[in-house]
């Protein structure tokens, strides 16, 4: 998957999973300008109203080239994200391997994120957490819990 490679377009994610259950992403090679594989669950007041989580996600045997993050949870977290297993991944030059982001107006819970067997080459950060990624008035609070990284 190539999305705006070498360009400067904003929000050019490679793969977006939003408000979905029982998802498998495997054998992908992603090169983009933003989040390579991004897990979301609704945005702001509308996301809180619908309140549909993303849960039971497996990401395996994938490569990420450049981009902001190999695996990103958020920033759209209103419906909650839980039970994500990511393994046997390679990051070449991404900003981070695991990127967690939300904002005070998004709310939701992000929990039970498990990453193992991740290879990182020329990656700026292994973990990036930004709980106030986009400054707006608060609708509700977010909660983060249960993260495991193992190599």
Tell what function each PLM region has.
Residues 1-151:
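Extracellular/periplasmic carbohydrate-active domains that bind, remodel
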């Amino acid at each position: 998957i190539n999305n705006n490679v070498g360009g400067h377009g904003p929000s050019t994610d490679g793969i977006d999973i939003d408000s979905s259950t029982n998802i498998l992403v495997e054998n992908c090679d992603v090169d983009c300008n933003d989040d390579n594989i991004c897990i979301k669950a609704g945005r702001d007041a509308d996301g809180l109203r619908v309140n549909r989580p993303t849960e039971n996600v497996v990401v395996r045997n994938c490569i990420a080239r450049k981009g902001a993050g190999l695996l990103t949870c958020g920033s759209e977290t209103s419906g909650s994200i839980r039970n994500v297993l990511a393994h046997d991944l390679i990051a070449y030059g991404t900003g981070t391997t695991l990127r967690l982001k939300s904002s005070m107006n998004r709310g939701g819970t992000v929990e039970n994120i498990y990453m193992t067997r991740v290879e990182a080459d020329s990656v700026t950060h292994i973990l990036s957490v930004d709980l106030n990624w986009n400054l707006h008035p608060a609708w509700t609070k977010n909660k983060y819990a249960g993260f495991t990284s193992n190599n």
